[in-house]
Amino acid sequence: MKLSDAEIEKLRQSGIRLDGEGRFWHEGAEVTHHGLRAALWRWLDRNPDGRWVLRLDDQRFVWLDVDGDVPYVVRSARWEGDRAILRLADDSEEPLAVETLHLRGAQPFCRVKQGRFDARVSTLAWHTLAERIDDGKLCGFVIPTR
């Protein structure tokens, strides 16, 4: 049996939302199962039309509502020598790509996951990074406003 385009579109309405703090919700309840949360982060992608999806492959995906249109949050940061190490909402860690750090108004953002995604930098993480800001620069890079 082949599904119509309308039936497929209806099935893609997942009811899953990613909030501004990096928490997944389904039909009003927070997703708390560690394994399921990890899978949802692995499947996170963006369609060419700009809509957020949870993708298994080119044909199998569902729509994802993302609050604020930025999926990742930098929850904390620490310094290892001259490198800032970020802890993201998916519990992964990666070095800050300093050249991607920018401000939108007063809110700091950077690129994560090899530059694939924007991430909002939390207040806690920003305070750690700000310890090394000198004359509007972090590690020699000017922090632009966009």
Report the location of each language-model feature.
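Terminal leader/tail segments of proteins
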Residues: 1-146
